[in-house]
């Protein structure tokens, strides 16, 4: 009987974790991050689920840079936004692991 109760508790915990993961994914889709380059002269905004939202370039930068430099600035801003999105995801899942006492090697994506 004890094994049945343990199994039932495990199934319940798994269902709760799955519900939490769904909520986290929704929250990440609603969370915006902004990557910046050249002190904010180039900005890329995307959701924490990596859906692009906008690209902004200060017009003065266009006058002062060539195409290759502009490409580099866009790439820097994109990488910055991606890092922020990755950090938001990591923070959300680390919090989930703590709340449900999940092991560090628990893979949320399999």
Name every feature range the model reports, one short phrase each:
Residues 1-30, 34, 84-110:
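Long amphipathic alpha-helical segments used for membrane anchoring, targeting, substrate engagement
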Residues 14, 50, 74:
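Residue-level signature of catalytic and energy-coupling elements of molecular machines
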Residues 30-56, 105:
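N-terminal intrinsically disordered, cationic/polar leader segments
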Residues 59-62:
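A short acidic/small-residue loop/turn micro-motif
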Residues 68-72:
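A short, well-structured alpha-helical segment
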Residues 73, 77-88:
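Stable alpha-helical structural segments in soluble proteins, enriched in small hydrophobic residues
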């Amino acid at each position: 009987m004890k094994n049945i109760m343990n199994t039932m508790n495990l199934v319940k915990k798994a269902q709760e974790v799955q519900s939490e993961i769904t909520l986290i994914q929704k929250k990440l889709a609603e969370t915006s991050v902004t990557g910046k380059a050249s002190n904010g002269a180039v900005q890329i905004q995307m959701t924490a689920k990596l859906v692009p939202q906008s690209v902004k370039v200060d017009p003065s930068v266009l006058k002062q840079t060539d195409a290759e430099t502009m490409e580099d600035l866009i790439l820097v801003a994109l990488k910055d936004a991606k890092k922020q999105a990755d950090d938001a995801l990591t923070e959300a899942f680390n919090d989930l692991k703590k709340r449900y006492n999940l092991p560090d090697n628990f893979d949320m994506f399999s």
